[in-house]
UniProtKB/Swiss-Prot annotation:
HIV-1 lineages are divided in three main groups, M (for Major), O (for Outlier), and N (for New, or Non-M, Non-O). The vast majority of strains found worldwide belong to the group M. Group O seems to be endemic to and largely confined to Cameroon and neighboring countries in West Central Africa, where these viruses represent a small minority of HIV-1 strains. The group N is represented by a limited number of isolates from Cameroonian persons. The group M is further subdivided in 9 clades or subtypes (A to D, F to H, J and K). The gene is nef. This is Protein Nef. Its main location: host cell. A motif (Dileucine internalization motif) lies at residues 164-165. A motif (PxxP) lies at residues 72-75.
Length: 206
């Protein structure tokens, strides 16, 4: 008996159910939209461009041509602890971020690339406030933002070949504390959630 949804007619359901059961939880420190993805498997109406900064930012990127499609080519999902650790080590191995001067534009490009290629919703790369070292809020992300010594900033800005638009030449204009920051890999961040210890108030709803 049974109609269209009888157990025997739903081919592949046991595999889907098992995949859902084994889905990893979202990492501590991800944003509200990623929590929706974890809990409901989709972004709900409680997180829209009108009330969620990450959703609004993503919508703006879709309207602007950024050089590659911003619709993910894989299923949308929240950043997990394991994925954050794996991504950190992948970027370290490829020489991607270590010592690179941080700017909001560079962070946006990285977030979009990860969203497009891996499907991780771009609300996970957030840091503790300054001044000083900024620690990642997402547990498992092993890159912190470290202030560059002022003499190194001055040295980098000497000469005629300096680009005024290079992040090091902007003297921290992106940063509320006006510090020039660089991404720095720290493997201990995979085991020690520094941000949670320094700012427990950010994790009340996690």
């Amino acid at each position: 008996m049974g109609g269209k949804w009888s157990k025997s007619s739903v081919i592949g359901w046991p595999a889907v159910r098992e995949r859902m059961r084994r889905a990893e939880p979202a990492a501590d420190g991800v944003g509200a939209a990623s929590r929706d993805l974890e809990k409901h498997g989709a972004i709900t109406s409680s997180n829209t461009a009108a009330n969620n900064a990450a959703c609004a930012w993503l919508e703006a990127q879709e309207e602007e041509k950024v050089g590659f499609p911003v619709t993910p080519q894989v299923p949308l999902r929240p950043m997990t602890y394991k994925a954050a650790v794996d991504l950190s080590h992948f970027l370290k191995e490829k020489g991607g971020l270590e010592g690179l001067i941080h700017s909001q534009r560079r962070q946006d490009i990285l977030d979009l690339w990860i969203y497009h290629t891996q499907g991780y919703f771009p609300d996970w790369q957030n840091y503790t406030p300054g001044p000083g070292i900024r620690y990642p809020l997402t547990f498992g992300w092993c890159y912190k933002l470290v202030p560059v010594e002022p003499d190194k900033v001055e040295e980098a800005n000497k000469g005629e070949n300096t680009s005024l638009l290079h992040p090091v030449s902007l003297h921290g204009m992106d940063d509320p504390e006006r510090e020039v920051l660089e991404w720095r890999f720290d493997s201990r961040l995979a085991f020690h959630h520094v941000a949670r210890e320094l700012h427990p108030e950010y994790f009340k709803n996690c």
